[in-house]
Amino acid sequence: MILVGIDEAGRGSLIGPMVVAGVAIDSNFLKFLSEIGVKDSKKLTRKKREYLFGVILEYSYAISLVKAYPEEIDSENLNEITYRAMIQIIHSMSVYNPSIVTVDKVGNASAVEREIININSSPRVENNADVKYVEVSAASIIAKVVRDNIINELKKTYGDFGSGYPGDKKTVEWIKDLYSRQPTYALPIIRRSWKILQDIAPNYYIRKRDGN
């Protein structure tokens, strides 16, 4: 039985893209993946994630990735962007005729459920799916490692801005320093619609065009 798991990384980040990943895998491999430590990527060290990334690639039928960059995220509702990415992955995985497609739920996911049904699969759209289902944990790891690699490349160009999340003091200080030097130009790696910018870099802040 083929299963597909879908999850994202970087949804709440202030810097860099959101990465949505899908993994198609034979259910016979789930026990093995669980035994070697495949679980929610947030509970793993970077070294462990990178090791498991290679194992997941080896044992999966397919990996599908969709990236959403700050300009897109600043222009639309984040849930809608996430759903669109998930639907794109669902369509790309339909060739494998998955029995069940499991998605870590974000808001009202009825559109995602409909698309899963449209490819003749059973939808399993649940909160905390990345903790409960190995195939979603695998997708979480893929998304996280891919995003981490993108962040590392960005740091080579823009300097060490920490994790890129608004709760990271290093990220906040990097934004403040950048703002002190160039208050009228926000780098394209920054999500300008994040409200923290109203306090730390007000000229960078923009309201989303859809009002969200």
From Swiss-Prot:
GO terms for cellular component: cytoplasm; ribonuclease H2 complex. Its cofactor is Mn(2+); Mg(2+). Coiled coil: none annotated. It is found in: Cytoplasm. Keywords: Cytoplasm, Endonuclease, Hydrolase, Manganese, Metal-binding, Nuclease. The keyword Manganese applies. Its EC number is 3.1.26.4. Its main location: cytoplasm. PANTHER family: RIBONUCLEASE (PTHR10954:SF23), RIBONUCLEASE H2 SUBUNIT A (PTHR10954). This is Ribonuclease HII. It comes from Sulfolobus acidocaldarius (strain ATCC 33909 / DSM 639 / JCM 8929 / NBRC 15157 / NCIMB 11770).
